[in-house]
Amino acid sequence: MNILAIESSCDETAAAVLAHDEDGFSVLSSIVASQIETHRLYGGVVPEIASRAHIEAVNAVTYEAMERAALSLSDIDLVCVTAQPGLIGALLVGVNFAKSLAAANKIPLVAVDHIKGHIAAAYLGESPLPEPPFLAMALSGGHTAFYLVKSYTEFEIVGTTRDDAIGESFDKIGRLIGIPYPAGAGFDRLAGEGFAKATGRENAPLSLYKKSEAYKDKTMYLPSPALADGSLDFSFSGLKTAAINLLHRFEQNGEDFDRALFAARYTYEAVEAVAKKTEEALSRYQVTSLVMAGGVAANSHLRRRIAEVAKKAGVTLHIPSLSLCGDNAAMIGAQGYYEYIAGHTAASSLNASAADSIV
């Protein structure tokens, strides 16, 4: 089966062509047109600008994906498109384009949930697929949640953030300490410098950082976003607000502070919160596989820490490659395949939705 997938939920216009056979998925092409440079001028995504950019890019991106895959539309057996959640104007561009393409060429159409797509990015690696039931977490600029994946199309939310997403908090604090939007990669590097400075070692385990004098420095205290109420939930707004107040105090008092050590402390609290809740989730649900996906899954400190948690719990960890952690269409095609074989085809009346309807 040859699959054409389209993604336009936020600030990347993406198209991909996948093939699926008895050996699994093959990504024949994956094209992403990023709007980062445009939105960087505003410090974040401007929805109207994003929608207009999608309109300008979607046809060319799809054509390039088909050309690189060396296929024509007559070779395509299935069209998949992100239909929710996301920016409504951005989603509508992809949905309407995919609907027109599918209808004009009499190809079945499947609507895909963006978060299910992120988790499906883990199905595109070389390792065996995680077998349901398994535990998955989606960590991005808009989502922070744990899911019990009962089948490749049936998900149950078992933990979530009650306010801000982990990626949004990194972007906000990153901007305040001079890291350009999106802050993820820059924050990762700066925190790495801070961890090395605090421990005297490159890529030191976070357990070593916790023993350092830098961690014991009370002037850099930040609270954990892991809620201590027996749930698998988070509150990243508390961590973010505490960090903002700390930065304001430094500024008002004319105090110098080490940006790298600050980034390390913030990263430590965010990563350890995810690790703590992952440990709790794995003890609560008897699974053999764990998937970590979404843009924040590219964070090197988080990847290493969750690998430690998975190893200790005796479960297999599946993390998409770095190129598939961010928004892309290949992941949408992978999830779309499973929706299709489950009989979840979309009608011509398909509409986009900004709301998250993963369950």
Which residue ranges define each predicted feature?
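N-terminal beta-alpha supersecondary unit
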Residues: 2-85, 114
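Short beta-strand scaffold segments in enzyme catalytic cores
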Residues: 13-19, 136-138, 144-148
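Short Gly/Thr/Asp-enriched flexible loops that form oxyanion-binding sites at enzyme active sites
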Residues: 81-105, 300-308
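Conserved phosphate-binding/catalytic loops in two-lobed NTP-binding clefts
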Residues: 111-112, 290, 307-332
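Conserved phosphate-binding catalytic cores of ATP/NTP-utilizing and phosphoryl-transfer enzymes
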Residues: 112-135
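Glycine-rich phosphate-binding/hydrolytic loop that grips phosphoryl groups
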Residues: 118-120, 320-358
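Glycine-rich phosphate-binding loop plus the immediately following alpha-helix
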Residues: 151-196, 240-241, 245-251
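A contiguous, well-structured pocket-lining segment that forms one wall/lid of small-molecule binding clefts
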Residues: 189-196, 209-210, 214-290, 300-313, ...
